[in-house]
Structures are given as structure tokens and as C-alpha cells.
Amino acid sequence: MKQTDATNIEESIQTDFKKDMSYGDYLQLDSLLTSQQRLSDHHDEMLFIVIHQTSELWMKLILHEMTAAIQAIADDQLERSFKMLARVSKIQQQLIQSWSVLSTLTPAEYLEFRDSLGHSSGFQSYQNRQIEFSLGFKNAQMLRVYEHETALFAQLNDDLQTPSIYDETVRAMHRRGLPIDEAVLNRDVTQDWEADASVEAAWAIVYQDVEQYWDLYELGEKLLDIGSQQQMWRFNHMSTVERIIGQKPGTGGSSGVSYLRRVLDHRFFPELWSVRTKL
């Protein structure tokens, strides 16, 4: 077969990896690509596994970026957090799109391997729980799901007690001289965020004087992007589940679509929404 410019390998390309690290070595592909172990013989179980595993990898990156962004805000380096938060928003778009791939799984196909899942469920995703905690959606009762794993339970309990990105944002607003009630600044951060009039009023000041508070204004918009994307992810999750299992209970024991629909009623960063009506 005649070699062409397109098929001929360049002489400078590295081909000897006996003593050097290769692409596969760096990414640990041997372990990564052998972790998709089907528990049934059904073809479509591979789709189910890969979608969930890749979602967990994206969630790991979200947590990596969120942790750094929260620290930047706590250090009053708001602009440094913008790139991280913009990246989180892009990752969320990938996660949202993944539901359209999973929705190619029909009810008949899912039934072929559903029993193999036992009581394992996406509800038990601890990284998704950590993301929700970092955004301010907290519920200590959720930790009961993880009591069987001592180290993980301890980590999630620490996450529950760590101020969310919204807690740190409101504290940063206070340090800038914006009036925030002491009760909000000293609130129990293990509890779900509840809308507060003083926080809404502070955001109104920011949005009415963008030039003076540009960094806080931009941070508010970045948070709203992330909150909106998280709601879209939840909606697509609910829609995909209903398309595949209808109104049946989830494998983890939840009410399935009914539970996911109730979760949709929760809104992240409520004052960033309500202030728009006040302006």
C-alpha cells in the first residue's frame, strides 16, 4: 500500500516507550477502561455504566473547581473565581447533554438488566451530594445513605459543615460594606439556605451600581449561570428517568420521578432571582 502524507508517520514522533511514560500510562487507561464491568449479558448495560462513570468524572472536576472558587471568594479574590465558575458552567452543559445519550435506552432494554443493579442508585452519588452541599442545598438526613462507609460518611459530614459558595459570597458582600443581617452571617451552615430580605436588598444595591460593585455583580451572574444549569440538569434527569421507567420507584427506594419533581421546586441562590423583580 502506497504511503501518503496523511498515513506516513513523522520521523520525530516518539515510538519507544520502554523507559518513558506514554499517554495510556499518564491517564492510567488500563485501570480506567477495565472498570466497566457489566453484571448482565445485555448489550445496553454498557451504555448505562459509561454514562454514569463519565458523569462522575465530570462531577469530580466540578468539585475541584468549586473548592478553589470558594477559597478565592473567601480570600476576597473574586475575579480569580470567575474562570473556575465559568468552567463549572461548561462542565454542567456536558452533564446536561449526557441525559440525551442515556435517553436512547428504552424501557424494554433497561428491564433486561435493571434487576442486576440491586438497590444501587444515582441517588447515592456522593459527588452529586457534595456539589449540592457546595451550592447551599443541604440536608443532614441524606448522610444516612453513606453510614456504611466510615471515611466517606466523615468526609460528607465535613462537607455539610463547610460554608457553601453562597455563604462565602454573602460574607464577601458584608466585608465590602453591604448591610447583611448578623443572623445570616452567623447562620448554621449545615442547614439549607433560606431567602433573606437583607441579602436581597444587598444584591439590589449591587445591581443598581454595577460600576462600583462590578466584581460582585459578575459573581452574582456566574452563580446564577450555575444555579440555572443545575436546575436544567435536574429537569433533564427527571425527564430521562420518566422516559425509561415511568412512575415506578427508583432502584434505591425513592419514589422516582415524584421525588425528582419535588427537588425541582428547590431554587439555588433565591435572592439572585427575587432581586430581579425588585429592580
UniProtKB/Swiss-Prot annotation:
Keyword Metal-binding part of the UniProt annotation: yes
Keywords from the named record: Dioxygenase, Heme, Iron, Metal-binding, Oxidoreductase, Tryptophan catabolism
Catalyzed chemical reaction(s): L-tryptophan + O2 = N-formyl-L-kynurenine
InterPro entries assigned to the protein according to its UniProt record, in alphabetical order: Trp/Indoleamine_2_3_dOase-like, Trp_2-3-dOase_bac, Trp_2_3_dOase
The protein's Enzyme Commission number: 1.13.11.11
Cofactor (UniProt): heme
Pfam families documented for this protein: Trp_dioxygenase (PF03301)
A GO term for molecular function: heme binding
Binding site for heme: 237
Annotated binding of substrate, by residue: 48-52, 110, 114, 251
Free-text comment on the cofactor: Binds 1 heme group per subunit.
Pathway in which the depicted protein is active: Amino-acid degradation; L-tryptophan degradation via kynurenine pathway; L-kynurenine from L-tryptophan: step 1/2
Gene3D superfamilies: 1.20.58.480
Biological process terms in GO annotation: L-tryptophan catabolic process to acetyl-CoA; L-tryptophan catabolic process to kynurenine
Family statement: Belongs to the tryptophan 2,3-dioxygenase family.
Record function comment: Heme-dependent dioxygenase that catalyzes the oxidative cleavage of the L-tryptophan (L-Trp) pyrrole ring and converts L-tryptophan to N-formyl-L-kynurenine. Catalyzes the oxidative cleavage of the indole moiety.
Subunit text: Homotetramer.
Protein's UniProt name: Tryptophan 2,3-dioxygenase
